[in-house]
Amino acid sequence: MSADGKFGDYGGQYVPEALMPAIEELTDAYERYVLDNEDGFMDDFRARLRDFGGRPTPLQRADRLSERYDREVYLKREDLLHGGAHKLNNALGQVLLAKYMGKERIIAETGAGQHGTATAMACAHLDMPCEIYMGERDINRQRPNVFRMKLNGSEVNPVTVGRGTLKEAISETMRDWATNVEDTHYVIGSVVGPHPFPSMVRDFQSVISEEARTQAREKLGRLPDAVVACAGGGSNTMGAFAEFVDDEETALYAVEAGGSTLEVDEEAGVAPNSASLTTGSEGILHGARTRLLQDRDGQIMESHSVSSGLDYAGVGPELAHLVDTGRVTAVNVDDDAALTAFHRLSQMEGIIPALESAHAFGYLESVVGPDAPDAENADDLGEYVVVNVSGRGDKDLESAIEETYERDIDIAPNMDEFTGGL
């Protein structure tokens, strides 16, 4: 990364003049507290991750998946982190940083509700008032997490503009921040936005790969041949990859949401997927240059995924750069494959994954499963594979049951009695 926050052609700071003082203040705080550990900030952060968050999370062998796929499959269990997802790593770090900076109010956006929940928990823990912006469509898809945010003392502001999803929630949160920069910190939930957010969020999330790398050496006596993680904005992806980037012997796979199809209708302004690394083009979104889903006129298209947390039209600039350089391989899994993987992991390992995480397991099935359509790529995964379980699926139960019933997923149990809701 360059001094101005660029990763090759991507990144940078494309924000209104009114936000530049806040961006500069945050950049200074990031360099002093996170990079230089001023006042023991990182020591404080890691202690809280341990005591409040429950780190380290285990690296667990998936016995039945290993047998099914004829290779050693290990799961990095971020679903066991306090709150049920990797999101606390970043939320706790940023809320603590805001406290060190003397800020008095926290705002955040959320899609699936996991980042909002993690931010609400961190604010309750650190005694900071908090407001969460969430698209109306996502509120309807993720009602349990809305209740959890409110239960932790945060306000939840519905966003009704556009499609009412993550993209619109980020835009509304940015507007709030621009109006209240003096006393407010915006806790961005992914490795997106203007510098220093992509680097800062990656650094807070890198504890995932830091632990996984050490645990792999302890359990396997070596590094894994491949690390697989789902990719929306890219926070769990970069967290799972960060400490492996310099290990050329470890392949890195970012699994995007292929939605219903990779075909894009530019005339209608609709991308029935959220695969910006696969089908997107270079542009500017939410303060950074990156790869995104846009039409010929540069207008952001509507994205789609069965998973709220992957339903985003862009991706983090560093991840886009790593794909361009060939260090990370971008792949995709459609809605049906993700839902099937959701049921398979639940039935075979007793772990109900978030629909986001299910995309990573869907890719595994597509490459090394008994009837794998992409079996020619099986050797690339190698003998030892680590899959990041970015979160647990409690939040997705209602939508997963509805989607399963509509799609007639082969391996799913009979859901007829539940189609009216849980």
From Swiss-Prot:
InterPro entries: Trp_synth_b_CS, Trp_synth_beta, Trp_synth_beta/beta-like, TrpB-like_PALP, TrpB-like_PALP_sf. Keywords: Amino-acid biosynthesis, Aromatic amino acid biosynthesis, Lyase, Pyridoxal phosphate, Tryptophan biosynthesis. The modification N6-(pyridoxal phosphate)lysine is found at K87. The keyword Amino-acid biosynthesis applies. GO terms for cellular component: cytoplasm. It comes from the Archaea. The keyword Amino-acid biosynthesis applies. Its EC number is 4.2.1.20. Pfam families: PALP. HAMAP family: Trp_synth_beta (MF_00133). PANTHER family: TRYPTOPHAN SYNTHASE, TRYPTOPHAN SYNTHASE-RELATED. Belongs to the TrpB family. Tetramer of two alpha and two beta chains. This is Tryptophan synthase beta chain. It comes from Haloferax volcanii (strain ATCC 29605 / DSM 3757 / JCM 8879 / NBRC 14742 / NCIMB 2012 / VKM B-1768 / DS2).
